[in-house]
């Protein structure tokens, strides 16, 4: 954005719905107060209306265009105090600056009103539009030349008289302006409902402070402002008035409320944050340019840097301007001196027309590394200086360079030649990637008309009906509607109008594909009747289900002989109210809707320090003699992917890089993977290798304490066809910062996904297909970056193969179910022990507890919840304080899996194994499915016995049950309910002496009821 562009934010307050009554008479008199970047505007009051309609536009100036996305627009809906004595707060809405649309692309969005505190009674929603307009500033008016008479008079007057007259004119102008403003206020006073506690606007600055030499014309009258800013009282800006209490945290820059949240995402706080990692000292050398005594600019020149056995040179250039930065890791240096030399290359052509290059040294300058200055940001960069090159053959040459000791936090580090990552190799540099913005594209196929099927007379007699379907294609995605049939008479006359009313949902990524191709095809002859292309730029967008997209007619074009084949009636829209899932639902890291107008402001900040790895195993060989690992780390949270630099040929690499993400939901997962870089080198044919997975960990943010640093080493385990293998450990530091407890509580009580997922849900099978489609789109888009993020890396991070059958995963899920049911089994064993009087004192206490529950039933719920409170409070001390749970190898059953099961897990679709191996696996799967089949039959039989009891399938059993119900009704009518509960309880826990080992009467009766098992073939 150019600096000379003025930006205005337009907030159009349209209407509100279903507000909370506040005046005691079932109505409310609502008005809206809008705050943005220190500016406040107010709408008119709509008296006694729970569905007010304003349609007012409020304008705000954007002071800093670059940081507009970090500002917060807050709308507070209030009830007029004059109409009621109750609370005036009706709700609030906060919109992040990144959700503002440009002029022309704005849409009406209804935001649900949020509570100010937990105890607020708020309901309803407010509809508004927020967009910005860029304007060019008006040209500065040219200074008018004073008239000659006025100028001469001014020159003739003494300085004292001139100053006095100037001051008099300014005083009169100020009085005139104040009078006009006063008249204007008197006119506007009866129109507006001014608050008694409002302050007057600040007075204009004293014009006497500036005394121009020439006469000043009276200022023009002030321009009328449609929405004047509302002065704020000191009490209104307090945080307790807004229901938000700031929470003190460890870091000084994290103190504040959610109104101060944009300060967490400022660049100055992000750029200077390296408190989660260790400072790595680097020796920086900036080689700017060289100057020769003999002005010979024809020969290329380069500089050579030597530190012990480490040497590197700049690129060879004729202009002698390099401006290159070199960063040497201090721990790897084996010398205390730096030698910089400048060399000249000269090409000599021999008699046989061959060219040879000779190099000549122009001079050398040395530095003692113990005397190199240190620089720590935010210090300014060290200015390069001219140094004279010492040379006996070519004296008088100079080189401009700067040498300093810094850390990885230095601004020059990212673009510098780095000694630990192989220099200036693009594939080994740290990068940040962004996933493409994904949308759901909904195509509703309604019907077709005037189809020109073109069947001959012979075809009509052979084919009684014609089956049609509609195929839609967006890029590589192809979806088809169901088949529909039309009769031969309709097909012959061309009057067939088949109707579908079916939705086809695609995944579209920005920038969109140019066209959506819709084709009507005939199944009977396998030919296309006609097709049309819908331009994606003409597709409208909707954010909720309150507005339906407009239906449109498109002509179907056939081949050259039939330019018109009919027309098709469809609805097309981009669904902005959904979140497009591109990862598994249980490890999702982002749940925001596609439309940025619906996005909420971030609630916190996630900071991740990738420190290093230890004891990595070699994954490849170098020079055919020794193993090596070139490791780097990829972290994903939300649409942001980060990739650290690759540390070459080290088993204990240290990255010490820190990154930040905005957090919009605490119940999300951070995914971190370690890989071996195989792409920075090419083979003999020029093809890049593949990156090898080393391990992966996940950190769920909801398990982290806020504003606390977690520094742990996580085991890296990878599943190979030969079995599970421990590849090493990675050291990660994580901190989740959130300045407001209220934002966290609101996040826990709101739905996980946007509203459209619940009002118009997608089917499980359809959502699974769309998720894998989104994964493929993200993988393909990141693979086209430069340098690319490999397909194997993205697939491993997104878990694209989690739907594939795996015996290991099936066992892991089965053991999870068993672990959960084991707690219920423990309770059942405890109750059985009480029934059988294993511990008589406990059974006696249960008798007393049963009597207390029956006699005082109102104490049951308080006792249960108090017991739960005490249990959870006592377990607080045993929570995981230090270690954050990540991938659990034991829970994943990686140690108890057979080699054949692992080989089956790595087998693709279709299988590539031998038929004998496939037969064995199929027989094993049949055995497991047989057990599941028997279990399902037993469960179904229990439900069928209950249905048989009420359907008189066994007349005698149902008759017995009917007689029992009759006597039971008389018994329960006569016997008090408390007596029945005591009797039933005492009978259930009676002493074993009064028990029988045989099954009870109800169990015998239920097992004799018939089921449908005997009717299954």
From Swiss-Prot:
Boundaries of every C2 domain copy: 1-110, 258-387, 420-554, 587-714
Bilayer topology annotation: Multi-pass membrane protein
Record lineage: Eukaryota, Viridiplantae, Streptophyta, Embryophyta, Tracheophyta
Protein name: Multiple C2 domain and transmembrane region protein 14
Presence of the UniProt keyword Lipid biosynthesis in the record: no
Source organism (scientific name): Arabidopsis thaliana (Mouse-ear cress)
GN (gene name): MCTP14
Ranges annotated as spanning the membrane: 851-871, 957-977
Record field: compositional bias (Pro residues): 217-231
UniProt tissue specificity: Expressed in incipient leaf primordia and in roots meristems. Observed in flowers.
Binding site residues for Ca(2+) 1: 296, 299, 352, 355
The protein's role, per its UniProt record: May function as a signaling molecule by regulating the trafficking of other regulators.
InterPro entries hit by this protein: C2_dom (IPR000008), C2_domain_sf (IPR035892), C2B_MCTP_PRT_plant (IPR047257), C2C_MCTP_PRT_plant (IPR047258), C2D_MCTP_PRT_plant (IPR047255), MCTP_C (IPR013583), QUIRKY-like (IPR047259)
One example GO MF annotation: metal ion binding
Keyword Cytoplasm: no
């Amino acid at each position: 954005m150019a600096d000379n562009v003025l930006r205005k934010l337009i907030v159009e307050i349209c209407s509100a719905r279903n507000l909370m009554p506040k005046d005691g008479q079932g109505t409310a008199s609502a008005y809206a107060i809008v705050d943005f970047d220190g500016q406040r505007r107010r709408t008119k009051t709509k008296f006694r209306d729970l569905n007010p309609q304003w349609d007012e536009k409020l304008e705000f100036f954007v002071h800093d265009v670059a940081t507009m996305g970090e500002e917060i627009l807050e709308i507070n809906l209030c009830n007029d105090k004059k109409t009621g004595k109750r609370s005036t707060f009706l709700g609030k809405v906060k919109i992040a600056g990144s959700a503002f649309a440009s002029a022309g692309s704005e849409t009406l969005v209804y935001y649900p009103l949020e509570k100010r505190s937990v105890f607020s009674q708020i309901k309803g929603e407010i509809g508004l539009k927020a967009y910005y307009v860029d304007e060019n500033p008006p040209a500065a008016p040219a200074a008018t030349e004073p008239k000659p008479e006025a100028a001469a008079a001014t020159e003739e007057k003494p300085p004292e008289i001139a100053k006095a007259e100037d001051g008099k004119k300014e005083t009169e102008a100020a009085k005139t302006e104040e009078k006009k403003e006063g008249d204007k206020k008197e006119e506007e006073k009866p129109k507006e409902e001014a608050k008694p506690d409002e302050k007057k606007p600040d007075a204009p600055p004293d014009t006497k402070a500036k005394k121009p030499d020439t006469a000043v014309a009276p200022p023009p009258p002030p321009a009328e402002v449609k929405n004047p800013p509302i002065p704020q009282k000191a009490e209104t800006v307090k945080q307790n008035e807004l229901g938000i209490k700031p929470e003190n945290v460890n870091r000084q820059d994290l103190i504040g409320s959610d109104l101060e949240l944009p300060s967490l995402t400022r660049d100055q706080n992000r750029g200077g944050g390296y408190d989660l990692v260790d400072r790595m000292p680097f020796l920086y050398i900036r080689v700017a340019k060289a100057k020769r005594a003999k002005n010979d600019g024809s020969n290329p020149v380069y500089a050579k840097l030597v530190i012990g056995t480490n040497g590197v040179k700049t690129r060879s250039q004729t202009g002698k301007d390099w401006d290159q930065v070199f960063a040497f890791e201090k721990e790897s240096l084996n010398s205390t001196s730096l030698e910089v030399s400048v060399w000249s290359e000269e090409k000599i052509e021999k008699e046989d027309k061959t060219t040879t290059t000779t190099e000549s040294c122009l001079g050398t300058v040395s530095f003692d590394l113990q005397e190199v200055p240190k620089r720590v940001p935010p210090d300014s960069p060290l200015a390069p200086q001219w140094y004279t090159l010492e040379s006996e053959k070519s004296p008088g040459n100079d080189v401009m360079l700067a040498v300093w000791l810094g850390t990885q936090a230095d601004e020059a580090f990212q673009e510098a030649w780095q000694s630990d990552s192989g220099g200036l190799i693009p594939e080994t540099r740290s990068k940040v990637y962004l996933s493409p913005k994904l949308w759901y594209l909904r195509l509703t196929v309604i019907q077709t008309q005037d189809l020109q099927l073109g069947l001959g007379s012979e075809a009509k007699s052979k084919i009684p009906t014609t089956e049609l379907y509609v195929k839609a294609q967006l890029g590589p995605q192809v979806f088809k509607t169901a088949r529909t049939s039309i009769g031969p008479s309709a097909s012959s006359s061309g009057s067939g109008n088949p109707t579908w009313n079916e939705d086809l949902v695609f995944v579209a990524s920005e920038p969109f594909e140019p066209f959506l191709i819709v084709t009507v095809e005939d199944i009977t002859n396998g030919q296309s009747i006609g097709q049309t292309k819908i331009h994606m730029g003409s597709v409208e967008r909707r954010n909720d289900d309150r507005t339906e997209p407009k239906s449109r007619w498109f002509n179907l074009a056939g081949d050259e002989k039939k330019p018109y084949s009919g027309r098709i009636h469809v609805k097309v829209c981009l669904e902005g109210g959904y979140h497009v899932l591109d990862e598994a639902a249980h490890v999702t890291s982002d749940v925001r809707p596609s439309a940025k107008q619906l996005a909420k402001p971030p609630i916190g900040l996630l900071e991740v320090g990738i420190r290093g790895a230890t004891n990595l195993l070699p994954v490849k060989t170098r020079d055919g003699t020794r193993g090596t690992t070139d490791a780097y780390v990829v972290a994903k949270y939300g649409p942001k992917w980060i990739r650290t630099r690759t540390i070459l040929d080290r088993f204990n690499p240290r990255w010490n890089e820190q990154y930040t993400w905005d957090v919009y939901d605490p119940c999300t997962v951070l995914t971190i993977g370690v890989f071996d870089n195989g792409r920075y080198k090419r083979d003999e044919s020029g093809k890049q290798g593949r990156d090898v997975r080393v391990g992966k960990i996940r950190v769920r943010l909801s398990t982290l304490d806020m504003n606390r640093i977690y520094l742990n080493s996580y085991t890296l385990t990878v599943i190979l066809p030969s079995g599970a293998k421990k590849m090493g450990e990675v050291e990660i530091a994580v901190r989740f910062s959130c300045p407001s407890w209220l934002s966290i509580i609101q996040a826990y009580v709101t739905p996980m996904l946007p509203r459209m997922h619940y009002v118009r849900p997608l089917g499980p099978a359809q959502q699974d297909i769309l998720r894998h489609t989104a994964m493929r789109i993200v993988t393909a888009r990141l693979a086209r970056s430069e340098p690319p993020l490999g397909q194997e890396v993205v697939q491993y991070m997104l878990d694209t193969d989690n739907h594939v059958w795996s015996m290991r995963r099936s066992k892991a899920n089965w053991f999870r179910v068993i672990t959960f049911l084991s707690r219920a089994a423990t309770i059942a064993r405890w109750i059985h022990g009480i029934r059988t009087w294993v511990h008589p004192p406990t059974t006696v206490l249960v008798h007393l507890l049963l009597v207390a529950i029956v006699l005082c039933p109102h104490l049951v719920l308080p006792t249960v919840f108090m017991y739960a409170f005490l249990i959870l409070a006592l377990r607080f001390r045993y929570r995981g304080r230090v270690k954050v749970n990540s991938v659990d190898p034991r829970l994943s059953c990686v140690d108890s899996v057979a080699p054949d099961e692992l080989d089956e897990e790595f087998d693709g679709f279709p299988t590539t194994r031998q038929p004998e191996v496939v037969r064995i696996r199929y027989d094993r799967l049949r055995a497991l499915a047989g057990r599941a089949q028997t279990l399902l039959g037993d469960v179904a039989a229990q439900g069928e016995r209950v249905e048989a009891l009420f359907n008189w399938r066994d007349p005698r059993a149902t008759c017995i049950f009917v007689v029992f119900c009759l006597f039971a009704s008389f018994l329960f009518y006569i016997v008090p309910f408390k007596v029945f509960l005591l009797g039933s309880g005492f009978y259930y826990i009676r002493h074993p002496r009064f028990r029988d080992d045989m099954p009870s009467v109800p169990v015998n009766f239920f097992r004799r009821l018939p089921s449908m098992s005997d009717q299954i073939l």
